[in-house]
């Protein structure tokens, strides 16, 4: 196992919740890139997105990720981190990357309203199209794919079995 773990996946996949549990169990530092963006910008993710636009938001997210110092770290990434190959290559070279796979139906049940999540998608893009677009990218960068459809404890145990 690499000395750090990064969790990737859609908004609502459980990255922050599972990241917290993993970090506590492994005695690693938890870094949540969404929280770092909010702290650095002193605004919510949605405010950062609305005020800066998609391209600038991606740049801010990339800079935050590239600033992470991996040392026994669990990184819970924002759902759009995968749009920066530079950031994802940095993550992959410094950690084991785990894709928390969740079906589109489950994501929509967990997060019925994305309007305040700082979720990046084109105006004319449906949520399902955004989900499908991201899924192949998550798979491309993942060292391990763990399905999170049976609850937090089950997903946590699956991760422990692959790291």
Model-derived segments and their meaning:
Residues 2, 17, 21, 25, ...:
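NTP-dependent small-molecule kinase module
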Residues 7:
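Hydrophobic anchor at the beta1->P-loop junction of P-loop NTPases
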Residues 10:
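P-loop (Walker A) phosphate-binding loop of NTP-binding proteins
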Residues 14:
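Conserved glycine(s) of the Walker
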Residues 33-81, 85-89, 132:
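ATP-dependent small-molecule kinase phosphotransfer cores
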Residues 71-72, 94-95, 141-142:
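Short, well-ordered alpha-helix to beta-strand connector turns
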Residues 78-81, 103-105, 151:
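Short glycine-rich anion-binding loops that position phosphate/pyrophosphate groups of nucleotides
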Residues 94-136:
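A glycine- and Lys/Arg-enriched "phosphate-lid" helix/loop adjacent to the NTP-binding pocket
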């Amino acid at each position: 196992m690499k000395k750090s773990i990064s969790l990737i996946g859609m908004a609502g996949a459980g990255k922050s919740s599972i990241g917290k549990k993993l970090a506590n169990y492994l005695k690693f530092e938890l870094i949540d890139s969404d929280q770092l963006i909010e702290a650095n910008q002193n605004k919510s993710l949605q405010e950062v997105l609305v005020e800066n636009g998609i391209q600038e938001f991606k740049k801010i997210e990339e800079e935050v990720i590239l600033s992470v110092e991996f040392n026994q770290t669990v990184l819970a990434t924002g759902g759009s981190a995968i749009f920066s190959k530079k950031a994802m290559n940095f993550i992959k070279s410094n950690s084991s990357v785990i894709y928390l796979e969740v079906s589109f139906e489950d994501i929509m049940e967990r997060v019925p309203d994305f309007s305040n999540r700082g979720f990046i998608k084109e105006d004319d893009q449906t949520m399902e199209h955004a989900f499908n677009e991201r899924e192949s990218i998550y798979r491309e960068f993942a060292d391990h794919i763990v399905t999170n459809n049976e609850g937090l404890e089950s997903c946590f145990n699956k991760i422990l079995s692959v790291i």
